[in-house]
Curated annotation (Swiss-Prot):
This is ATP phosphoribosyltransferase. Equilibrium between an active dimeric form, an inactive hexameric form and higher aggregates. Interconversion between the various forms is largely reversible and is influenced by the natural substrates and inhibitors of the enzyme. Gene3D superfamilies: 3.30.70.120, Periplasmic binding protein-like II. It is found in: Cytoplasm. One of its GO terms (cellular component) is cytoplasm. The keyword Transport does not apply. GO terms for biological process: L-histidine biosynthetic process.
Amino acid sequence: MIHNNRLRIVMQKNWKLSNDSKDLLARCGIKINLYKKKLIAFSENMPIVYICVRDDDIPGLIMDGIVDVGIIGENVLEEEVLSRKLRSDNIDYIKLKRLDFGTCRLSLAIPLDKTYKDISCLNNSRIATSYPHLLKKYFDKNNITFKSCMLNGSVEVAPRAGLSDAICDLVSTGATLEANGLREVQVIFRSKACLICKVGDISSEKRNVLNTLLTRIQGVIKARESKYIMLHAPIKRLEEVVQLLHGAERPTILKLAGDNTRVAMHMVSSETLFWETMENLKLLGASSILVLPIEKMME
């Protein structure tokens, strides 16, 4: 029996989104033992219970107010919203935070030997997909008539099997499309994982836990987006160095022993450091450049 005073978080039970969700919560300092076949688990150090379900069940559990919080892909969320609108079901939820994983896109793809100029080439085509409502929304917006072939998996084999003329499926790298003789021609929806919660009363105890969780998630994401930079820079080029690094705050400047022309600079950079940036730092006279990951960060 799940105690009502625990914050109930629901997330995908399998696949990569599940692993990324567990990793995020672990980085937030929440201790939990979620084994592969264990679908319910209690946090050891916070009043939280985790429930693992199929990803397409998560939006409904939130919208119906059965659980408090969910981690879900925006593609699944929006598909369920459109589906529930047709059934006149409740679609209320609050999006608390867009997360930094689960990046993918829902795209149209056609066989390599098929000619494509624009979306009108697919007029009156049969499209295989697991996302019929998102597909219909996009085609209706573009005044395209189509016939759908609903598949819950292996969508990419549909054209070769003679089931469809094209497909509408999730794409991450495009390798699966290429392996099945398909090419991506149009992105119709871009998606990331997001944190959502139910609309309605949440007890003050649960609200406090949720606020703590949100603060920690923000800290984890900010840390992953930032780097700690240490370098030596000429005093006369200091402002140019600072402008190049886009620091979250002004840098810490330290004197160097026995050198009046250079200083040591420490700062948190809010942008990813590419090799080109480091090479430009070198051109400005910087040396001993160190770029370090940040484990945790709180502003």
